[in-house]
């Protein structure tokens, strides 16, 4: 049975992919999951420089679920390109790299470095606080989302997926802003 799907010109052998953040780049899961069976691995967010993440405890079990505040811990794009991309290239799966940043310039620096990598698509996490806009997440104001999407689209040589924030009153307004700015796809949503 053919289970392939095509998104923004990229064909996946099946629609099963990991969610960013929960799977890292898959290195820790080799004993549990055959990465060759996945349509794609969506990596944990990567920034222009290493981020230490939040201090522990980062996860708490509560009645009816769990709370988490990881803080986008990541090794930075340079380590990621040397370690994670080569690891993922050993598998028959597409690579979608989740990109995070604190300023538009941070995002653009990561996107530029990923342009010549083996990544198939880029997922742009706009739930990150925008330090130039009073720490309001890029994805919480339609004009900020339009701006960052259009700037990334102009820089990227790979299809971009805008990963929207759940912390908005009307997510359709945000999706329309990303689409109008040239996003190739929309991903819903970051942690709530």
Question: Across the structure, where does each feature detected by a protein language model lie?
Answer:
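N-terminal capping/small domains of soluble enzymes
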Residues: 1-95, 101
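Alpha/beta enzyme core
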Residues: 90, 102-192
């Amino acid at each position: 049975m053919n289970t392939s799907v095509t998104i923004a010109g990229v064909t996946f052998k099946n629609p099963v992919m990991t969610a960013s953040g929960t799977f890292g780049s898959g290195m820790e899961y080799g004993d549990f999951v055959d990465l060759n069976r996945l349509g794609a691995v969506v990596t944990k967010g990567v920034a222009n420089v290493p981020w230490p993440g939040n201090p522990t405890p980062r996860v708490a079990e509560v009645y009816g679920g769990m709370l988490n505040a990881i803080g986008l811990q990541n090794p930075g794009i340079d380590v990621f390109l040397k370690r994670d991309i080569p690891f993922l290239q050993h598998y028959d799966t597409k690579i979608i790299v989740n990109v995070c940043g604190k300023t538009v310039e941070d995002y653009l620096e990561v996107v530029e470095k990923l342009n010549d990598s083996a990544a198939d698509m880029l997922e742009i996490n706009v739930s990150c606080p925008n330090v130039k806009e009073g720490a309001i997440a890029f994805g919480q104001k339609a004009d900020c989302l339009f701006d960052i999407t259009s700037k990334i689209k102009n820089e990227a040589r790979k299809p971009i997926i805008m990963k929207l924030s759940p912390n908005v009153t009307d997510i359709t307004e945000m999706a329309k802003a990303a689409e109008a700015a040239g996003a190739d796809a929309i991903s819903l949503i970051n942690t709530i």
